Every structure is written in C-alpha cells, then in structure tokens.
Amino acid sequence: MATSKGRNADPAAALRDCRAAFIGVGVASALVNLLYLTGSFFMLEVYDRILPSRSIPSLIALSLLALLLYAFQGAFELIRGRMLVRIAGALDESLNGRIYRAIVKAPLKLRMQGDGLQALRDFDQVRSFLSGVGPAALFDLPWLPFYIAICFLFHPVIGLIAIIGGLILTLLTYLTNRGTQAPAKKASEAGGLRNVFAQASQRNAEVVHAMGMSARLTALWERRNTEFRDENRRTSDIGNGYGALSKVFRMALQSGVLAAGAVLVIRGEASPGIIIAGSILTARALAPVELAIGNWRGLVAARQSWQRLKELLNALPEADAPLQLPDPHERLTVEGLASGPPAAQRLVVSDVNFTVRAGGAVGVIGPSASGKSSLARAILGIWPAYRGSVRLDGAALDQWDSDALGKHVGYLPQDVELFAGTIAQNICRFAEDATSEAIVAAAKAARVNDLILRLPNGYDTEIGDGGMTLSAGQRQRVALARALYGDPFLVVLDEPNSNLDAEGEQALSEAIMSVRSRGGIVIVVAHRPSALASVDLVLMMNEGRMQAFGPKEQVLGQVLRPQQVERQNALKVVAEGQEAKQ
C-alpha cells in the first residue's frame, strides 16, 4: 500500500493513498452483505421445500451449501477487518513523523493549550477507531436499501415494516449524534486540562511535599476530575440510552415481523418460510444501524480528532528543504531584530543590532526581565523575528534547513532538560552515526569527562526521564557537552553557571575559550560576573532593548561607573546623616 511519507505528508494525501484499500474494504463488504442472505434463504428453503418434501438428502445438501457460504462469509469478514487494520497502519506510517514534528514545533509557532500532546492522542483515537468494528458498520449501512428491497420481494407488508424500522433507527442515529457531539468535545477538553494538571503536579512533587500543598492540590484535582467525569458520563449516558432504545426497538420490530408473517400465512398470502426468513432479513437489515449507534461515540471522537489533526497540520505546513548552504564559518549578524513569543504578536526584544566574527564571544548582561534570555531565543530562531533578521555568514535563519542548521548550533537553555537514555545518547543528540571519539571529545570540551567516568556505567549510564538520576550541576555540565558536540559554529549559553560550583565555572570558562580558539562564536547570557571571564564583547540589555555593545572593558566601564558614583553618593548621604546626629 503506497503512502505519502516525508515532509509534505498531510491527512488528505494519506487518505487518498488508501483509496485502493478502501475500495477493497467496500468490495469485501459487498460480498459479506450478499452472503448474509444465506441464513434467510436457508430458512425459506427449509420451511417451504425441505419440510413439505421430507427429504433428508436435500436437507444435508442444503446444509453443506450453507456451511460453505458461511465459511466464505467469515473469510471475507476476516479480510475486511485486516484491511481496516492495515489502513490504520498505513495512515500511521504516513503521518506519524509529521505529527511528531508538529508536536515539537507547535510550542514554537502557536499559542498552545494543554500539555501539547493532544495531537498524539487524537491520532491514537483515529487509528483505534479504524481498527475497530465502527468502520465495518459504516460500510454495511449503504446495504440497508438492498435488504429492504429483498423484504419487499418477500411481501410488501414486511418491506413496509422494514422501511419504518429503518427510518426510526436512522432518527435515533441522528439524535445520538446531536446529543453526544457537544459533551464529547467538552469531555476531551476537560480530560486534556486534567492531564496537564497531573503532569505539573508530578513535576513539582518536591515542592508539593515540602510546602504542604497536597491537600489543596488534591481538592483542585478532584474538581477538574469531576468536570471530566461528568462530561464523560453525560456522553456515555446519551449514547447508551439511545443504544438501548435502538436494541429494544429492533427486537420489538423483529417480533413484529414474525407476527406480520404469521398473519400473512394464516390468510394464505405468504408461505411459512416467510415468517422466519423475513425476521432474519429484517434483523440483518437494521443491525448495521444499531451497531453504528453503539459505536457512535467512537465515531464522533474520531471525527473530532481528525478535524483537530487537520487544523494543526494545516497551521504548521512543512516546506521542502531549502538549498544546502556551506557551513558557516565567518560571522553572526543581528540586524534590527524585534522578537517575541510565538503567536503572541507582542515584542519582548526590539532594535537589536550587532555583529560577531569568528572567534568572538559576547556576554549578554542586564537586570532581571530585561530580555536577555528572550534575545537568546530570538538568535536561535526559537522565537520568530517579527522585524529584522539573524544571519549566519549572510544567510538568514529561514534560509537554512532546520536539521542542517542544528549541526552548526549548540544551545544550553536556562532550564536544562535531558532525555531518557544514556549520557552518551544525550551528548550526541541521539545521532545514530555518532562515534565514541566525537562523544568523548564533546565531554572533554565541557570538562565533564572525568565526572562521567566516575558514574556507575560511565557514558552508558541511564539517566532517566529529564536526567532525574543526576544532580542539577551534573545535568548542566552534560547539557554543555551536548551543546559542544560536533564543534558547532554558534554556541548559545543561557546562564550556564547557575548550578555550577567553582570547579564547574572554571570548566565553563575553558570550554568558552576552546570554542573561540577553533573559530566558533559564543553567546553567553550572564547573571554572574564570573560568566564573563572568557568573553571579549559585552551586550547590555534593558527593557528589551540593546543599551550598549562593544569590547568588554569599555561596556563594563560604562555600566559600572554610574553604579560606583551612585554607591559613593549613598555612602556620602549616610556619613552626613551620622555627622548631623553627632
């Protein structure tokens, strides 16, 4: 089965690629529904021909033929079910990579709600529905008129009863859809918020325990869980109510067909076989409707999930990879940069202009909330540039393929996050072609090789989700090695010494100097003065704007001189006050 794999895979194309498989399911459904007539005609022949003739050989032959047809019916049912499972697998093969990339990209491009994993749950919902009995019922529904037509061939009265039953069950299907759609959507939204709250509580377990927040958070959890449970129960109650009503109605309708057939036989207007055959056929005609009602909740959930997936993927289109550019090796240029959070349209950084050549290192300083970390995100393209540009060797970031650019960029975020896996896997960024030499070289560049070797399994030590088995300082130094892996041209470090001791700070300074010595560029967001030891340039940020940029001694002199004057004036005021008291 062909699939539209790759960067440009989209839901519509994935479904088109499955067109032949859906046609195959339709053909299998046609054969299954034709073979469903076996039971009705078997009973008709038994009552109208076999019993009057009292022929045992004819009964045996007819029974063998029925068994053969039932075997074919079962085989086609099996084929149809397996084809639906493989359609679900083909959609997964086609879209799973695109959906994963969208999940990762969405926080950088869109204003997200919930835990950001709704798309993954939506895709699981669609795949689960396609692999179940719901689609088979939908493929059987178009055969309802065919069965009703056969009922008319038996007798117009039986056909009329089947039509009335079909219309009533169709009405129940419509009411089921209308009644469950809104609560199902609310239940999905409430479930997402509940999951986000649970994950946040788990991440902050130490804070919850230390500050005695468990009781209050439990009460809040119970309110959110109650909202989810109530909407879920409402959806189930509506679906189960209409499902039970349709089942009772179908059983009553089947008894009505038996009664009508008996009346027709008594009046001599039909043969005795019509009583049983008509009942079986009517039940079969209406069974897909009842099955559809029973699986309507899954259908509604799958339809809503599919719609959300399409909206997400349409909001995050994937362009073809641009032309491969030469490796950057000359300069970083920031021109009139204005940036802010994704989809917020709110500028946090404005009017930033500077150029750094190979071998240079910039320390970004400024008071809290001055835009230092925001500038780092904008330089890396994590936050969009609403005005201006960031260029490497003259090429704007959007002219690079993100994967290709990533090889030339190292990033140590302020909040370090490692992945579940080994230390070696985290350092090499999970590259399958990574060599031991490159991994060890990155660790040595970050001066963390000896620390790693002291761990139980060295580079093969499993660190758990988020690096939970490591201390904060160890995580930061492993993340620094990850940023230095592959000798990237641009290395951005956001408060890299926040969790480091004196030894770690010395290792950081040496790592910055090693990047500069090989011709790389380092951007260091500094909160402690010690982080500026190995930089030659300083950029001063204040209220989201660049206040100064230039050689370290010059900029620090401009910054520190007013502070020294202010301190001296303060001391003078204190001294004068003491003299006045004396």
UniProtKB/Swiss-Prot annotation:
Top-level taxon in the UniProt lineage: Bacteria
Subunit: Part of a type I secretion system composed of PrsD and PrsE.
Sorted UniProt keywords: ATP-binding, Cell inner membrane, Cell membrane, Membrane, Nucleotide-binding, Plasmid, Transmembrane, Transmembrane helix, Transport
Transmembrane segments: 22-42, 59-79, 148-168
Gene name, Swiss-Prot/TrEMBL: prsD
Every ABC transmembrane type-1 domain range: 22-301
Protein family (similarity comment): Belongs to the ABC transporter superfamily.
Main location: membrane
Localization terms from the record: Cell inner membrane
Cross-referenced Pfam families: ABC_membrane, ABC_tran
The organism of origin for this protein: Rhizobium meliloti (strain 1021) (Ensifer meliloti)
Binding site for ATP: 366-373
Protein name listed in UniProt: Type I secretion system ATP-binding protein PrsD
Function: Mediates secretion of glycanase ExsH.
GO BP, one annotated term: protein secretion by the type I secretion system
Molecular function per GO: ABC-type transporter activity; ATP binding; ATP hydrolysis activity; ATPase-coupled lipid transmembrane transporter activity
Presence of keyword Transport: yes
Gene3D superfamilies listed in its UniProt record: ABC transporter type 1, transmembrane domain, P-loop containing nucleotide triphosphate hydrolases
GO cellular component, one term: plasma membrane
ABC transporter domain ranges (all copies): 332-568
Membrane topology: Multi-pass membrane protein
